[in-house]
Amino acid sequence: MSEELRSIPPKHGSFVFTSESVTEGHPDKIADQISDAVLDAILAKEIELQEQGYIAPNGVPANVENVRCACETLVTTGTVIVAGEIRTQAYVDVQEIARGVIRRIGYNRAKFGFDCDTCGVMSLIHEQSPDIAQGVDESFETQTGTTTDPIDLIGAGDQGMMSVSYTH
């Protein structure tokens, strides 16, 4: 622990809690909206394919219950990078989705500091790895037969929310 943290006098008990919050127009908010829009488009397309009875060339039918999406987006000056692992039978145009979100937010001119029509959009999305799929589809406890608790049966992959606190 740093000396700076040790020197903070405790208030209302002896812990320090911190969190991040960003304001309107922050690149993190734009990035989250792009990732959400990619997932929404994939789910909508997968449902459409499922209703049509689509079966992929590898013999796997479209099924919205089988969609897995770990989509992360980075937004910086003039550039959007969308990356991650996705399991779906659907194809969506990531570049079009990203530009549409940016346009809807209002970044449609270079004089605004970001232009939906001229920014670079890179899609680095690939198929979900078997290792990640294993952890998402079935929890470790399910795979080893060590639990029957319904909560413990749910797989989690590599996603999680962290909450950190410090106590004296």
Model-derived regions, located:
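Glycine-rich, N-terminal phosphate-binding loop and its surrounding beta-alpha-beta segment
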Residues: 48-51, 55-60, 64-138
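Conserved small/polar residues in nucleotide/adenosyl-binding loops
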Residues: 167-168
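Hydrophobic alpha-helical hairpins/lids featuring a short glycine-rich hinge
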Residues: 126-161
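A short glycine/serine-rich beta->alpha loop
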Residues: 20-26, 86, 149-152
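Globin-like tetrapyrrole-binding proteins
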Residues: 164
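N-terminal, positively charged regions that mediate nucleic acid binding
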Residues: 9-49, 54, 61-67
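Short coil/turn connectors at secondary-structure junctions
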Residues: 13, 17, 76-79, 115-119, ...
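Acidic, low-complexity proline/glycine-rich segments
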Residues: 4-7
